[in-house]
Amino acid sequence: MADETEIQAAAPAEAAPGAEGQGERRGRGGRGRGGNDRGGDRGRGRDGRGRRDDRRGSEEQGEELIEKLVHINRVSKTVKGGKRFGFAALVVVGDGKGRAGFGHGKAREVPEAISKATAAAKKAMVRVPLREGRTLHHDGNGHFGAGRVTVRTAPPGTGIIAGGPMRAIFESLGVADVVTKSVGTSNPYNMIRATFEALKDQTSPKSVSQRRGKKIADLLGRGGASAPVAEAEAAAITE
């Protein structure tokens, strides 16, 4: 009886190495398939990135931005092994409601350069006050480098009298009537920066009245308008 008990007790001990081998094989299989630990983490990582992209897409779709490709050129970088060629893109982005920005991006491929420039433009958007939502409040000048631009307010029906990079800015900004003039260099980068310098100086009667602590009608009345006309114009100003 004692021998039989020893034999039965030894049987599970002999089966233990096989069980350990199966456990090791299962462990290797889990790592190989990537289904238990690290594979699950990778899956969650992909899903997480996908959800973040979807959120960004929904925000961009709700904003409905206007994107204009202004200029693209080929660039090169000299390194130890020779030259690396790529592309540089200049993009203007706006919402058509008084906000616009520009961005510059470089990459080895054209689509990637445009994508980088668009992302930079969205981060650099500025608000420009518009009169009646169609034109500027007053004339302005801007310069950058050798480029100098002049922007003027215009009556209804004038349209956008601008060319090249400046037209892209006003179309994305939502301006319907404006007269512009560019003097000096025709470099699109300088023209874009000079135009934004002129737009940053734009002020509205509402902001001036808040800064000076006066009524909008009082400011408009100083231009020679009668009190009723000044009050009507002040009531029509939204920004």
Swiss-Prot record:
Gene Ontology annotations for the cellular component aspect, listed alphabetically: small ribosomal subunit
Listed InterPro entries: Ribosomal_Su5_D2-typ_SF, Ribosomal_uS5, Ribosomal_uS5_bac-type, Ribosomal_uS5_C, Ribosomal_uS5_N, Ribosomal_uS5_N_CS, Ribsml_uS5_D2-typ_fold_subgr
Keywords, alphabetical: Ribonucleoprotein, Ribosomal protein, RNA-binding, rRNA-binding
Bias (Basic and acidic residues) ranges: 34-62
Low complexity biased stretches: 9-19
One term of GO molecular function: rRNA binding
Disulfide topology: none
Coiled coil: none
Keyword RNA-binding: yes
Domain S5 DRBM: 65-128
Similarity field: Belongs to the universal ribosomal protein uS5 family.
Function in brief: With S4 and S12 plays an important role in translational accuracy. Located at the back of the 30S subunit body where it stabilizes the conformation of the head with respect to the body.
Quaternary data: Part of the 30S ribosomal subunit. Contacts proteins S4 and S8.
Recorded domain comment: The N-terminal domain interacts with the head of the 30S subunit; the C-terminal domain interacts with the body and contacts protein S4. The interaction surface between S4 and S5 is involved in control of translational fidelity.
Protein's UniProt name: Small ribosomal subunit protein uS5
